[in-house]
Amino acid sequence: MCAGITCALTPAYNLRWRIGFYPTTLLELSLLATMVVFLVETLRYRRRPQWRNPFTWPALLFLTAGAIAVLVAPDHRAALGLFKAYLLEPIAFFFVLIEVLSSWRRAAVVLLCFGVAGIAISIPNAALVLDALGHHTLNAALAAPVVIYNTPNAVALFLVPMIAVASSLAAYTPQRRGRLIATGFLVIAVPACLLTFSRGGYLGLLAIGVGLALGHRRRIALVAATLVAALAVSRIPPIASRLGHEVNLADPNNSLVERARLWGATLRMLRDHPLFGGGLSGFKQAIAPYGLRQSAAEDVMYPHNIVLNAWTETGILGLVAFGWLLIQAVRVAITGWREAEPSWRPLYPGVILAVVAMVVHGLVDVPYWKNDLSVEFWALLALAWAGLRWRGPAAGHG
């Protein structure tokens, strides 16, 4: 129950305050409460957690890289806060989840709670954008308005992995009730994601659609239908206007031109600091001497590329660890699709689609490196492993 509440509260990292000198969030307090309850229950019933799993070694490597990144960061206090929020607590939550998700029923509760979180951010943000469209106050050249998060991209980054999992459940779950719940979530979340006008989010949605089509025996027809549907959506006036800025390289609102400059400056910085990057929270300061105009350098916290994000924050060691985690997620999902109990199997194509969508979206954005996204990521890995962990004595994959 505590784990489900924590999943439902993932967007609540925006609710912040201090307990004495210690800054915290509602999400962090929920994570800590879940861990305390788990520890008490473990000691009470003298359970022995299973630490060894396909994600243990890459998780330890990621933690090691993060600890080094704290040491090399220009602001150790800020870096320690990010280490705690993006690495230590989500990874600890992962180990809690793989112990408590001992049945598909429990896993479904966690997924349902993530769905509640997704709907909670989808409806108000979509309503605000629709109101702006209705009053003709939306400027497609600029970021869409948001309610809960600071940017519309943050909404898309949170929703896209959940849309991937929900799409798989809607397609493969044999029970009608499960399909209806997943479809109901998609009916709300997909339009909300489109209304963020996030170009990276659109790429992620396209990857999910193509991936689902490729998994069907009529893949050629469905891939063609997916591409036609994507083209039709891209011609909706506000979306077409938003995308139009990206094909005009002379347009001052073309974000790809700015991204290219940012990536170039980042690569120059990494050429000089290949092992450790800029350290956790150190990207702004690290990138400043490398030719990026001052106003852009002040606004950018990450290089907006999934490879460069991990490299600049946690060094080459962290990049290797993050890539290892993604590979392990796909490997576990493939095994789960073949070997897990039938009730778990519809989850696994969704895990693969979520990883693919994250990578595609991450070509131009910042997946993982936020409080909610890191918890969502590790919860997804926990769900993937739990289906194999609890299938019976034969589940001893290392």
Spans of features found by a protein language model:
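A conserved mid-to-late transmembrane alpha helix and its immediate loop/hinge
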Residues: 190, 195, 264-267, 273-276, ...
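Juxtamembrane membrane-water interface segments that cap and precede transmembrane helices
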Residues: 11-19, 72, 136-148, 296-309
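Membrane-interface micro-motifs in multi-pass membrane enzymes
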Residues: 21-30, 82-86, 147-160, 311-315, ...
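Transmembrane signal-anchor hairpin modules in multi-pass inner-membrane enzymes, especially those
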Residues: 1-68, 77-78, 102-112, 170-179, ...
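Long extracytoplasmic/lumenal interhelical loops at the membrane interface
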Residues: 247-264, 276-314, 335-338
